Amino acid sequence: MTATPFWSQIAAQAKADGRPFFTMAPMEAVSNTVFRQVISHAAAPDTFFSEFVYAKSITNPNTKFPVHGRLYVAAAESQKPVVQLWGNEAADFASATAELRDRGFEAVDINMGCPDGTVIKNHGGSDLIRNPQWAEDVIAAAKTSGLAVSAKTRLGYSKVAEYHDWIATLLSQDVAVLTVHLRTKQEMSKVPAHFEVVDDLIKMRDAIAPETLLQINGDVADYQAGVALAKAHPGLDGIMIGRGVFANPFAFESHPQSHDLHELLGLLNMQLDLFDDFATRYDVPRFPSLKRFFKIYARPELGATDLRNTMMDAKSTDDVRKILAAYQVKMRVTNHS
């Protein structure tokens, strides 16, 4: 079955603009509809990835890793995200991708790099690096749906040098996009990304699978850094940004501007409203999961440390709104005194 032109269209538009394409990384409890809409409002990438979705759960709601709203796409979103699937059973990927196709999704990405212990114990994520036959089987199964199939992985499990064989194996599967996080599973995010191997990855792609788009992830802070990286490494197609959005929700801004605390708190208020709307549809996520986002908006360099600390004691979104309202009144009084 012929795959959809999802990725080729994204890459072609970026190339016409003289830049790499940009995506926001799949992140657990982060890249759901709520945060995707916030980032889209601030500065959108070319496309988004969903949270991690257990492949079996899409057609079997009784699994231990249920979907719980991970596939929900709000009407306000301009496009459906790439669904990131994890697991190791080919049959699960065949049935999951067929169901996703019927729901109107165009692309799936297979997680082959997550270092989480629970995921690995259940034979997903970076466990596929140690079991390349599983990787080959799930890619082949996903392709039967006709969706665009990509994969996201790391350089290796324990050693950087593993990429010579591992990345070659994945490139041989003819995926639409191969995203490489420039660290090993063992390194997590504790060491700098291995940018020294990027040119070698490009050479491997050109030799083995010239039609596969190569995307890099790891230590790329923003749009400008991504453009510079692509210029330094001709042949690099895409840039994925993950943790960079926690340092700057405007990370995908092509022409960087200054953003004051008022604007950042406006994004937070937007996220609170979207969170409440999502909570009326699903029983997750719980309010405490929101607290990880406060540091994005109440930034120390903007004098908002006390505000952030106060919000961390909140018990609900309404509590946060009251704290923000009181803070803004205080700021107006201070500015006019």
Task: Give the predicted meaning of each segment.
Residues F22-A25, F48-S50, P81-L85, V108, ...:
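Hydrophobic faces of well-ordered beta-strands that scaffold small-molecule active sites
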Residues A94-V108, M112-N122, Q133-L214:
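Alpha/beta enzyme core
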Residues H123-I129, E187-M188, P256-S258:
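Short glycine-enriched, charge-decorated loop/helix-capping segments at active-site entrances
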Residues T63-K64, A74, G117-D127:
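An active-site metal/cofactor-coordinating segment within enzyme catalytic domains
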Residues T2-A12, M27-E99:
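Glycine-rich, positively charged N-terminal anion/phosphate-binding segment
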Residues M27-A29, V53-A55, W86-N88, G113-P115, ...:
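Active-site beta-loop-alpha junctions enriched in small/polar residues
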Residues M1-G18, F22-T23, V34, T144, ...:
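Alpha/beta catalytic cores of nucleotide-metabolism and tRNA/nucleoside-modifying enzymes
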